[in-house]
Amino acid sequence: MVKLLLLNLLASIIFYTNIPLPYINGLDFQRVARLVPTVGLIIGGILGLFDGGMNYLGMPVLTRSALVVVLWIFITGGLHLDGAMDTADGLAVGDPERRLEVMADSATGAFGAMSAIAILLLKTSALTEIGEYRWLVLMAACGWGRWGQQVAIACYPYLKATGKGAFHKQAIRSYKDLLPGLCLMFAISGLFWLVNNHHLLISVVVLIAGSAIATLTAAWFNHKLGGHTGDTYGAVVEWTEALFLCVLTILT
């Protein structure tokens, strides 16, 4: 059981990131979405370690935050950011019937470029305003973003029968498949209180804000398109991360 879980986690990391790991024959990539919040926490942990190292070297917070965002893109290979860009291009089309066609086009349009700039600016500026427990904030942001992806998979129809993200529907079929990730994020939210018992309010806000932003972002894209695609899964991740960081600046 433990071996199978570790193999599934390895498959998820290989699928969703550029983290150099040995490839093992026979890995099952059909269920990678089940462990995607855990992958998010791993990504956030790496970003937190990098941020802490740069802080130790005396790097200014703005430069440090910008480098963290650059590393963020590198670790994920821009997978989710590309989806957010394609989604923005599709939503910019007035004709609903042409939106999926535009999203499938690999060429980046003006709205896609603007959405990428907006996401990167929001992440960088928000991180610059967050002074304490940045490692934990990064883990929470990455985790909630990917739990939002699970919400989109579980709760809404997939719009393409043979799309690149269609197989995720076989891994996450119902609301109960969201519970493991939610419990994991509940634990991460509780860490804010454990590291400082005066931060109980922050723990509660992290839990409520993270779950609400993830859920509402997935619902909004479903409202605009009538369902989801692999691109909108990426858009949910990126916008949940960015908006979550923005909300946390209020607490600091």
UniProtKB/Swiss-Prot annotation:
The keyword Ribosomal protein does not apply. It is an enzyme of class 2 (transferase). It is found in: Cell inner membrane. Pathway: Cofactor biosynthesis; adenosylcobalamin biosynthesis; adenosylcobalamin from cob(II)yrinate a,c-diamide: step 7/7. The chain crosses the membrane at residues 4-24, 39-59, 65-85, 102-122, 135-155, 178-198, 201-221, 232-252. Keywords: Cell inner membrane, Cell membrane, Cobalamin biosynthesis, Magnesium, Membrane, Transferase, Transmembrane, Transmembrane helix. It catalyses: alpha-ribazole + adenosylcob(III)inamide-GDP = adenosylcob(III)alamin + GMP + H(+); alpha-ribazole 5'-phosphate + adenosylcob(III)inamide-GDP = adenosylcob(III)alamin 5'-phosphate + GMP + H(+). GO terms for biological process: cobalamin biosynthetic process. It comes from the Bacteria. Its EC number is 2.7.8.26. One of its GO terms (molecular function) is cobalamin 5'-phosphate synthase activity. One of its GO terms (cellular component) is plasma membrane. Its cofactor is Mg(2+). InterPro entries: CobS. Joins adenosylcobinamide-GDP and alpha-ribazole to generate adenosylcobalamin (Ado-cobalamin). Also synthesizes adenosylcobalamin 5'-phosphate from adenosylcobinamide-GDP and alpha-ribazole 5'-phosphate. Belongs to the CobS family. This is Adenosylcobinamide-GDP ribazoletransferase. It comes from Nostoc sp. (strain PCC 7120 / SAG 25.82 / UTEX 2576). The lineage of its organism: Bacteria, Bacillati, Cyanobacteriota, Cyanophyceae, Nostocales.
